[in-house]
Amino acid sequence: MTDKKSVLTQILKELNAKNSVEGSAAITRDGLMIASVLPEDVDGQILAAMAATMTGAAETAVSEIKRGLAEKVIVESKQGKLLTTGAGPNAILVALTRADVNLGLVLLGMKKAAEKIEREVK
């Protein structure tokens, strides 16, 4: 594992451990995996591609309706949540949670992790 990848993996492990996150990933804006700590039943490559597509679509939609910059995307289902947030101009942070998680705490943890990821991915 490269040094940068190991640093990113550690950031993701901390996010998962401290914030009731079941899985997380740092991905490129074009949908490639940089680093991940995901459950075994989640295909990281598919998650990366879909999360990048969703984030890009949300950013375009918000821009088109003149509402500034999209900060995060939240998808909720009965089984859990999928959240994405930008981690600078080059990366996106993705998190998977249970449905009953404290969303505020997860988003705060994601903000801190995204700032760390942005510094590493420059």
Where are these regions (language model features)?
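Non-catalytic interaction/Regulatory regions outside core domains
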Residues: 1-122
